[in-house]
């Protein structure tokens, strides 16, 4: 091909890509423009949105068969989320709205989860809620569920299928806002230890990008080191101790996004180092440690709550089954901001420093009904869900 023609073709390709990107951005802006401004603010660039596929969804008759597909029930967070969903669906069963609640667990095997979801389709479930084991591998079976008239609602992570309704936090925004809050706590000057989750995980990449953006906006804060805690207490404590052993300089803040803030504090104490401001997801053991060490635990973060994850899936699925029309396919749930000044409202006497399987109940509903209404055409609260009736962390 002559050099001039090659250059012309290349310029046309670049122009076409730019045009397509611009059109997609315009479509995205128009779609998000249908949401209230408070909800639009929850969508940053990494979040992909499409129109909901359920604008003309045909309502299944009552009583409904509710099916839940779990990808892994092997940690306390997932067990807690599953128990809360079981409680909520159980209340709907008592009211006569649900005939049966079926649960599958693929134990980390995506192929098995696909097979289990196909079984749910064969059993003519009215709705499938899921914590997906893959963002892409379930797309075909989700499309098959849609063709069978079965809506699929994901929580605690999204899938790429346009036939699902995803309910999730914006991990990119969470990582950014937490970092900004931590940096403000130290006056915009100091040293930050970054403790990410599982390196390379899609959610971790989004969280890290949020941290990087906040760091770039705060030139007075320098990154001391970046380590991977893998969202587990033992690994997190080990890598923090290693960092402290090889980084003699002062650490002013620790940014993390998991529920391992208590072991981070313990690592600093073990190393004989002053406690920094620690960020992450609040947990029962962290609140227990705070109560046992008054005045020492400085915190800025939020809570990725298993209770709320289950509640959000239940509420969105219930609205679908009752005829409310989602505007978009990815619903962003707000993340509550929590500091150590708020701990007294979150702490319960049952919380000890070893309460690793205990997750605090937010004092107030972090996703109020009027806010959720903005995601639906004809949005209205469902009487089947009453946040005031959520059991307390320490039981009745």
Regions of interest found by a model, annotated:
Residues 135-173, 191, 285-295:
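Flexible loop/hinge segments that line or gate small-molecule binding clefts
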